[in-house]
Design a protein with these regions (language model features):
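PIN-domain endoribonuclease scaffold, especially VapC-family toxins
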Residues: 1-86, 93-98
Length: 102
């Protein structure tokens, strides 16, 4: 999946926002800035997936497998857009087959 050049990859604007918040609070633990992440994504051909109203609304219908609001947004976006969500978070696969643990 990752090496297939036909696949299109997206990064949620919520992920950029999360990096910005966490880097500001703990730069020792999160050494990457939001600007660096955006630059990396653009240079790598990764598309931005903006948070839309319907994504925000979809969070309310998710089962409570995970309490992190950023991760819940990623799940809602992937589900609403019909995308696969690649994650290393063990709490996300219960949301469905579209969540791929990496």
């Amino acid at each position: 999946m990752l090496q297939d050049t036909e696949n299109v990859f997206y990064v949620s604007s919520a992920s950029i926002w999360e990096v910005a918040i966490k880097h500001s609070a703990r730069p020792d633990e999160i050494p990457v800035t939001a600007e660096q992440m955006i630059r990396f994504c653009r240079n790598s051909g990764i598309w931005e997936l903006p948070v839309q109203f319907r994504h925000s609304q979809a969070v309310s219908s998710l089962p409570p497998h995970h309490n992190d609001p950023f991760d819940r947004m990623l799940v809602a976006q992937a589900r609403e857009e019909g995308l696969s969500l690649l994650s290393h978070d063990r709490q996300l696969p219960p949301y469905g087959e579209f969540v791929i643990f990496v």
